Amino acid sequence: MNFTKSEQLYQEALEHIVGGVNSPSRSYKAVGGGAPVVMERAQGAYFWDVDGNKYIDYLAAYGPIITGHAHPHITKAIQHAAENGVLYGTPTPYEITFAKMLKEAIPSLEKVRFVNSGTEAVMTTIRVARAYTGRDKIVKFAGCYHGHSDLVLVAAGSGPSTLGTPDSAGVPKSIAQEVITVPFNDVDAFKQAMDRWGNEVAAVLVEPIVGNFGIVEPKPGFLQAINDIAHAVGALVIYDEVITAFRFMYGGAQNLLGIEPDLTALGKIIGGGLPIGAYGGRKDIMEQVAPLGPAYQAGTMAGNPASILAGIACLEVLQQEGVYEHLDHLGAMLEAGILTHAKTYDIPITINRLKGALTVYFTTEKVENYEQAERTDGEMFAKFFKLMLHQGINLAPSKYEAWFITLAHTEEDIEYTIEAVERAFKSLKNE
């Protein structure tokens, strides 16, 4: 493939945009560097870059594009918004309709509030939990990303359960010291942390199914233990479902797993490709939010008609019969094909898959927590990424990210992808 225009535009971008990208995850730093491919348009399951190269897309914008790009029903909703005003600064009937849809899909959402991103949604649930409990500390799990607010850009210290240290320059140590980090899927470490700090903990923040160091499911009993131990000391439980909501079924991962949190943060899929976030939960907790309560949260763009109408349209598509069966079928087909060729060429991989989302780890070790994900072979993934890119397969440029299948993908797309995987594995084997 020829990437001349992408390379030229990236050099130009470096002159005007920090790092040449508007999110560090779009950089190719984690896969050896170089110019990221600059995409010009997208339709269905496909991208076309500025050099005219076509790709099958498994990035799906890091999760939101579950219907495929430019889905006609969502496009029509966005066009309606454009023709009737995209921002009012007033209540609209659309936000009521959408709130009702979310409540019906995820029963733990007794009340909801719209914001503009998953980062905002998580940030505000933490504020609300602190307001409700009168406590300051938060427990999170190592490797789980919850947006870029100071509250959650915190890394684990040494030991199985620790007060955090800043995971970014510019995050005060004083904020990091309010965050306790423990390994995901480790009930003993969580219990140890709560035994020590539980009476100071406002909330436990967790992805019910991890999406940010790959797709990692909770061990049986893990989430129930979180609920039981947290509630025993008066702490709340917050589910970050920014990635997981509507990804595996119509509703949240909490529906799938049969365990309800006190508060939930949403984003990505619920916007149909436009910027959005939402949070909600128990009525008595949500009534801490202004104008009813003392926990302040506001937003000029919150609940704007364009994002809300796109979100309604997206959920209407996802309500159709056979949607999640299609994603699961293609996911199983892709997983089986990759595993077959890995065995043929003796490539060490482990695949974590749930429905239409999967992560291919270059390791023989089972991946159930961040420490295990860290140990996977990033150098081999980087080579694999480039080999796939040159065959027209667009993956996230990180060993930690998921492959997302959309409603627009076909069996033919999966078959071509499996063939590309075989060629990539053959090249890796012959090095």
From Swiss-Prot:
GO molecular function: glutamate-1-semialdehyde 2,1-aminomutase activity; pyridoxal phosphate binding; transaminase activity
Biological pathway: Porphyrin-containing compound metabolism; protoporphyrin-IX biosynthesis; 5-aminolevulinate from L-glutamyl-tRNA(Glu): step 2/2
Compartments where found: Cytoplasm
Cofactor(s) needed by this chain: pyridoxal 5'-phosphate
Regions crossing the membrane: none
GO cellular component: cytoplasm
InterPro entries attached to this UniProt entry: 4pyrrol_synth_GluAld_NH2Trfase (IPR004639), Aminotrans_3 (IPR005814), Aminotrans_3_PPA_site (IPR049704), PyrdxlP-dep_Trfase (IPR015424), PyrdxlP-dep_Trfase_major (IPR015421), PyrdxlP-dep_Trfase_small (IPR015422)
Catalytic activity: (S)-4-amino-5-oxopentanoate = 5-aminolevulinate
A biological process from GO: protoporphyrinogen IX biosynthetic process
PROSITE patterns xrefs: AA_TRANSFER_CLASS_3
Keyword line: Cytoplasm, Isomerase, Porphyrin biosynthesis, Pyridoxal phosphate
EC number(s) stated in the UniProt entry for this protein: 5.4.3.8
Residue numbers bearing the N6-(pyridoxal phosphate)lysine modification: K268
Entry similarity comment: Belongs to the class-III pyridoxal-phosphate-dependent aminotransferase family. HemL subfamily.
NCBIfam families: hemL (TIGR00713), PRK00062.1 (NF000818), PRK12389.1 (NF009055)
Subunit structure: Homodimer.
Protein name as it appears in the record: Glutamate-1-semialdehyde 2,1-aminomutase 1
Species assigned in the record: Anoxybacillus flavithermus (strain DSM 21510 / WK1)
